[in-house]
Curated annotation (Swiss-Prot):
UniProt-recorded name of the protein: TATA-box-binding protein
GO molecular function, one term: DNA binding
Entry-linked Pfam families: TBP (PF00352)
Function comment: General factor that plays a role in the activation of archaeal genes transcribed by RNA polymerase. Binds specifically to the TATA box promoter element which lies close to the position of transcription initiation.
Keyword terms, alphabetized: DNA-binding, Repeat, Transcription, Transcription regulation
Species annotation: Pyrococcus abyssi (strain GE5 / Orsay)
Keyword Secreted: no
The Sequence repeat ranges on this chain: 11-87, 102-178
UniProt superkingdom: Archaea
């Protein structure tokens, strides 16, 4: 079995949808959110940027949000709490606590070895490789649902996971497939 101890994954982006359970007057919200834009003819929500935590929020009159750019779930929770405090300051009433739903997590990583992507693409099921269009193999994992981009350097990008555990499971499945088809050798133990 391939050892994943040498594989490193780092969160690059988390996208979450949020329901605040409150109706929002976007003109009033615009007044309390510096670093924001609102042009209803172009987009029906406010685009707001926070510096701490460093995230972008799409704020809609329905009280629904999209938070993106976060590097941790804690950053999303902090951003939502920060917005709620600002909204309370203009008299917004909330029916209940916010509901945060992680939609997508993107990780970058390194498997720690190089790959011949032509061999990978010809052998591995559930993958696509068109080097004229993109320099990596696109490997699709069904359960947990995720997409892994594998580059010849051994670097990877995993997207579509809803949790870090799902990302790790997707990477383990890729490594097992690479090993199963002889595209990666087990490291020999030193005597």
């Amino acid at each position: 079995m391939v050892d994943t101890n040498n594989v490193k994954l780092r969160i690059e982006n988390i996208v979450a949808s949020v329901d605040l359970f409150a109706q929002l007057d976007l003109e009033k919200v615009l007044d309390i959110c510096p670093n924001s834009k609102y042009n209803p003819e172009e987009f029906p929500g406010i685009i707001c940027r926070f510096d701490d935590p460093k995230v972008a929020l799409l704020i809609f009159s329905s009280g629904k949000l999209v938070v993106t750019g976060a590097k941790s779930i804690h950053d999303i929770e902090r951003a939502v709490a920060k917005l709620i405090e600002k909204l309370k300051g203009i008299g917004v009433k909330f029916k209940r606590a916010p509901l945060i739903d992680i939609q997508n997590m993107v990780f970058s990583g390194d498997i720690g070895r190089e790959f011949n992507l032509d061999n990978v693409a010809l052998t591995l099921p559930n993958c696509e490789y068109e080097p004229e269009q993109f320099p990596g193999v696109i490997y699709r994992v069904k359960d947990p649902r995720a997409v892994i981009l594998l580059f010849s350097s051994g670097k990877i990008v995993c997207s579509g996971a809803k949790s870090e555990a799902d990302a790790w499971e997707a990477v383990r499945k890729l490594l097992r497939e690479l090993e199963k088809y002889g595209l990666i050798e087990e490291e020999e133990e030193e005597l």
